[in-house]
Amino acid sequence: MGNIVAIVGRPNVGKSTLFNRLTGTRQAIVNEEAGTTRDRQYGKVEWTGKEFSLIDTGGWVVNSEDVFEEEINKQVKVAIEEADVILFVVDVLNGITDLDMEVAQILRRCKRPVIVVANKADNYDLHPASAEFYSFGLGEPFCISAINGSYTGDLLDKIVATLPEEKVEILEEELPRIAIIGRPNAGKSSLINAFIGEDRHIVTDIAGTTRDSIYTKYNKFGLNFYLVDTAGIRKKGKVNEDLEYYSVIRSIRTIENSDVCVLMLDATRGIESQDMNIFSLVQKNKKGLVVCVNKWDLIEDKSQKVIDSYTTAIRERLAPFTDFPILFISALTKQRILKVLETAKEVYENRSKRVPTAKLNEVMLPIIENYPPPAWKGKYIKIKYITQLPAGSVPSFVFFCNLPQWIKDPYKRFLENKIRENWDFTGTPINIFIREK
């Protein structure tokens, strides 16, 4: 289970720039496709062997240029509740504002480590100006320039030194860990209640060592697994779940703690931007996926044509990853809910599936010979050998060739698709690595 670091601060202090600098991406700023524009608010950072999730909580506020005090307060409260370390970003050029002081006042009362990041210190002459930030009472300000990267490496050193030691969840049995995720009112609580029902003797709540993690052991109908919850679904109910960034941030720990995620969609509303954001978290964490279209009892026309229409629309929105099961259920009437668990178990088993090396080469090499990678400057790229890496959390295949650097993503997708056509990896991501032979 990874740690979470949250970036907070008023608008225009450089939170998104810092986020892009630390995660090494410019993904959402460069690529403003519908449904992906909020992707930049969540990323993975690895530094000196330590990994953490980084969240720009301010990015979840709509029209963040015109943020009101109330929205900033909400943003900070979310960070306090969810994060292990908080980066409080301020602007060394403009100094302290009333809004900065209000944020600092809230942060002083919280029990999380806070690092004051004095941004826009683009040259060393500006560093002395950061002394006024001592008045926050939150310790020594850390001068950086997110725009040119000055001192951001030192900031990362400071962050990883401040992170709490990761505690490993020790569960009594090695069982699939299944998370029910989705935006508010998609039916998460209803599905969990349908699974658990009144038979409280069939479940055992195991408090995780990580804050707010709860593993509910489920054994019924011959199925055994842990239901992963971070107290966001059953314990806290609908408190603040109307806030999009709140429910998505809340999903992060649940997803990171799971093997397979059941993404709940509302049949009456189709697939929306918030569904896309949560799907993006599943993809980035390389978890197994089952998509459930809930509230199917409310749809009058349940013909195969309508089912096909829903299925096509979902796969188009979630492309390029389309090899996942889609189930049409009703948590309220308990229609097909057992199928959800059975399918999640199949996806879990696909994650640990191994293909014998001899069979892999026997099937894939003739395909590659018929459809070789594009030549580079007249040089032919020859893939000579394929193997699957030893069991990990994600099935991973290595293709050995003479010019690995010239095999691009479209051809890697082609290889992945051919593997999926020949072996059942439904619901699980696949890693494709190209190495020099």
Swiss-Prot record:
GTP 2 binds at residues 182-189, 229-233, 294-297. Pfam families: KH_dom-like, MMR_HSR1. InterPro entries: G_ENGA, GTP-bd, GTPase_Der, KH_dom-like, KH_dom-like_a/b, P-loop_NTPase, Small_GTP-bd. Keywords: GTP-binding, Nucleotide-binding, Repeat, Ribosome biogenesis. Residues 353-437 form the KH-like domain. It comes from the Bacteria. GTP 1 binds at residues 9-16, 56-60, 119-122. The keyword Repeat applies. Coiled coil: none annotated. Gene3D superfamilies: 3.30.300.20, P-loop containing nucleotide triphosphate hydrolases. GO terms for molecular function: GTP binding; ribosome binding. GO terms for biological process: ribosome biogenesis. Residues 3-167, 176-352 form the EngA-type G domain. HAMAP family: GTPase_Der. Associates with the 50S ribosomal subunit. Belongs to the TRAFAC class TrmE-Era-EngA-EngB-Septin-like GTPase superfamily. EngA (Der) GTPase family. GTPase that plays an essential role in the late steps of ribosome biogenesis. This is GTPase Der. The lineage of its organism: Bacteria, Pseudomonadati, Bacteroidota, Bacteroidia, Bacteroidales.
